[in-house]
């Protein structure tokens, strides 16, 4: 019979899994890679076994719908050949009418950087993070423009 153990933080969980024979865990791809863990390929609705990487997760996210507020509705049944169907997104919540214009400008600057190629593509993709592009990127940038 197996046992359940825990560790603090994604780093701790990944390190513990790397030291524990036959262990199974969930961790972001960059933590798995850093700790030399194998990652699970998932069979998607198109019937392909796909690995969790930036390209495949981005292919999945590209099949989602984004509303005017940036909320995404995922299409878990997509037949996109390379789509990794367990992709997630992070949301940034920001005030559009902040009384503190200095803080609003700093938040806007951070959000702009996070969506920029120098962050998202050059750094984020190398760590396994998905990259927004095309219409999704344009929608996200238009939402960032409202921060203030």
Question: Where in the sequence are the language-model features?
Answer:
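Short linear sequence motifs
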Residues: 19, 24, 67-69, 77, ...
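Ligand-binding pocket segment of bilobal, Venus flytrap-like solute-binding proteins
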Residues: 1-63
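Periplasmic-binding protein-like
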Residues: 41-91
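Extracellular/periplasmic juxtamembrane helices and adjacent flexible linkers that interface
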Residues: 74-148
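Residue-level signal for the start and early helices of compact helical domains
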Residues: 4, 15, 30, 65-67, ...
